Design a protein with these regions (language model features):
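Generic recognition of cysteine residues
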Residues: 23, 76-78, 152, 186
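Surface-exposed charge patches
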Residues: 8, 98-99, 168
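TOPRIM metal-binding catalytic domain and adjacent DNA-binding surface shared by DnaG-type primases
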Residues: 1-38, 46
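Phosphate-handling DNA/RNA-contact segment within nucleic-acid enzymes
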Residues: 33-142
Length: 195
């Protein structure tokens, strides 16, 4: 019922009020009653909540971040488009689709959080391929109409490494577009804070 702290936190992060309101109306964002965390909800085709990510709204110290126990990564947080779309943008974290939507202002594509990525530490040599993200594979299985995947991972070593591997894994079947934030070391949520 009361999402005041989530509103204040996301507005402070530069997220557009209309984006926040739309997410709350859709039931994919709310404020937890106990600790006032922002709760990003992933739903299945029937509208049943299957995934939740908690993000602390207090801005001092290290922020609290955790997936809710029992969350199913096949149904990570996702912003739907206004109309049918054959485009999908993918992000590392739940706040990033909101931030990128705020910056772009377009609702012409699905915006899916992968619920994090795996990448080796910078400087370590690895020829091992990245496992395909569960959230992405499951989304594509449910949405055979998708033709384009826009990779919007962070512009840091891990994000670029993941982008390379995701592009390699899905090219040929999908049109791949790389759209990392222009600023080195940033994600889209960092860019909305700077506006």
């Amino acid at each position: 019922e009361n999402n005041r702290r989530v509103f204040a936190y996301l507005l402070k992060r530069g997220i557009d009020r209309k984006v926040i309101e739309a997410c709350i109306r859709a039931g994919i964002l709310y404020e937890s009653a106990d600790y006032h965390n922002a709760v990003f909800v992933g739903k299945d085709e029937t509208g049943t909540a299957r995934y939740a990510f908690l993000r602390g709204t207090y801005t001092r110290g290290n922020p609290f971040k955790a997936e809710v126990s029992g969350s199913d990564k096949r149904f990570c947080f996702c912003l739907p488009p206004k109309r049918e779309s054959k485009k999908l943008a993918i992000y590392e974290a739940a706040i990033e689709p909101l931030a990128h939507l705020t910056l772009e202002g377009t609702t012409d594509k699905w915006r899916l959080s992968l619920g994090g990525i795996y990448a080796p530490e910078e400087g370590t040599q690895t020829s091992r391929d990245m496992k395909k993200p569960i959230a992405l594979d499951a989304f594509l299985a449910r949405h055979p109409e998708i033709e384009e995947i826009e990779i919007c991972t962070n512009n840091d070593f891990a994000g670029r490494w993941a982008a390379d591997h995701i592009e390699k894994a899905y090219q040929g079947k999908y049109r791949m577009v790389r759209n990392l934030p222009e600023k080195e070391g940033c994600d889209y949520a960092d860019l909305t804070k700077e506006r």
